[in-house]
Curated annotation (Swiss-Prot):
Keyword check for Transferase: no
GO molecular function, one term: toxin activity
Purpose of the protein: Increases the permeability of the small intestine mucosa by affecting the structure of intercellular tight junctions (zonula occludens).
Effect of A349S: In strain: 86015
InterPro entries from the UniProt entry: P-loop_NTPase, Zot_N
UniProt-recorded name of the protein: Zona occludens toxin
Keyword Chaperone attributed: no
Length: 399
């Protein structure tokens, strides 16, 4: 004997899903049904379950009217023992704002208590197993379910309509502790994708008009022109940034935005570049975001911090250049060539001034001078580092 709370936004298949998962098995097992779900079609149910209509026992309570809501609110006064209660929009029956004083109006008369009826609302839900009642409740939001019911239920069932990602008639069913909302990943006990059989929708009237439509958010992503356009723009920006399209003459028209030759002589002052003597070309002419990092109008922002893009950084006594990458303990490590040898970027973790942020494809990285609020956009030169040992000598003069 259980209390099931099925909840989800309108159109998330909570009623049809609960009917399919809870009500039909109860009917098949011969249970007496007490429900407020309108327009149940017994003939279609019987055909689907392969049983006779005469074997289906359903008691309908019209909760669209106040008298019906009060009757259902006191179900333990009169409900047959071992009945299955299927109550739609339970927040209308027992609003969560009801106080202990309000609920006393639902208390059982002494003569019914003498007939082994629960004496109060709280006792009815706490002892539903004792009386053989299974109770299935649906609501748009589990917050609309009274706390005393949630405490007795233990488990909630959250519905999410997968039509929002183009998969009509499917929903994700997440089980969770009824004390929480089920909306966080950490709340989920189990998660399943389910598809409701089409005959289920013809077994009841989901609206007072008898007509219902799937969520308008159910347009498939690959059919939405705005989404396709957005994906196209994002793809071009990432390609422009990560795959060197800003250096391709086909895209640049052969302008001087290309990186200078790697064969040029080292600069006289200590700078950071993508190769010895080369100049880092900052992507200042376009804007995009990767996670918390955004590039726009010649500036790089990371969270609340803002840095001006520059062509080089002044680093005392030595220059740093990206020389390649190396697989170490299954982790891709970018090295820098210094006067002391090749230094992994991990050593920058101990720096108060300089920080290094690799971008997702490790083709580029950003070096931040936190004191000067400057950022240098650097492209990784492929190949092995000059030295593989981690030479830390003299690094204190930098960091």
């Amino acid at each position: 004997m259980s209390i099931f709370i099925h909840h989800g936004a309108p159109g998330s298949y909570k009623t049809s899903g609960a009917l399919w998962l809870r009500l039909l098995p109860a009917i098949k097992s011969g249970r007496h049904i007490i429900t407020n779900v309108r327009g149940l079609n017994l003939e279609r149910m019987a055909k689907y379950l392969k049983m006779d209509v005469s074997d289906i026992s359903i008691e309908f309570i019209d909760t669209d009217h106040p008298d019906g809501r009060l009757t259902m609110a006191r179900f333990w006064h009169w409900a047959r023992k071992d009945a299955f209660l299927f109550i739609d929009e339970c927040g209308r029956i027992w609003p969560p704002r009801l106080t202990v004083t309000n609920l006393k109006a639902l208390d059982t008369p002494p003569d019914l208590v003498a007939e082994d009826r629960p004496e109060s609302f709280e006792v009815a839900f706490d002892m539903h197993r004792h009386h053989g009642w299974d109770i299935c409740l649906t609501t748009p939001n589990i917050a609309k379910v009274h706390n005393m019911i949630r405490e007795a239920a233990e488990i909630g069932y959250r519905h999410f309509n997968r039509a929002t990602v183009g998969l009509g008639a499917k929903f994700t069913l997440t089980t969770h502790d009824a004390a929480n909302s089920g909306q966080m990943d950490s709340h989920a006990l189990t998660r399943q994708v389910k598809k409701i059989p089409s005959p289920i929708f013809k077994m009841y009237a989901s609206t007072t008009t008898g007509k219902a439509r799937d969520t308008m958010a159910g347009t498939a992503l690959w059919k939405d022109r705005k989404i396709l356009f957005l994906f196209g723009m994002v793809f071009l920006m990432f390609s422009y940034s990560f795959y060197g399209l800003h250096d391709n003459p086909i895209f640049t028209g052969g302008n001087d935005a290309t990186i200078e030759s790697e064969q040029s002589e080292p600069q006289s002052k200590a700078t950071v570049g993508n190769a010895v003597g080369s100049k880092a070309v900052a992507p200042a002419s376009f804007g995009f975001c990767i996670g918390r990092l955004c590039v726009q109008d010649g500036f790089v922002t990371v969270g609340d911090e803002r840095y001006r893009l520059v062509d080089n950084l002044d680093i005392p006594y030595r220059g740093l250049w990206a020389t390649g990458h190396h697989i170490y303990k299954d982790t891709l490590t970018v090295f820098f060539e210094t006067e002391s040898g090749s230094v992994p970027t991990e050593l920058f973790a101990s720096s108060y001034r300089y920080k290094v942020l690799p971008l997702p494809d490790f083709n580029h990285f950003v070096v931040f001078d936190t004191f000067a609020a400057q950022a240098l956009w650097v492209e990784v030169k492929r190949g092995l580092p000059i030295k593989t040992e981690n030479d830390k000598k003299g690094l204190n003069s930098i960091f």
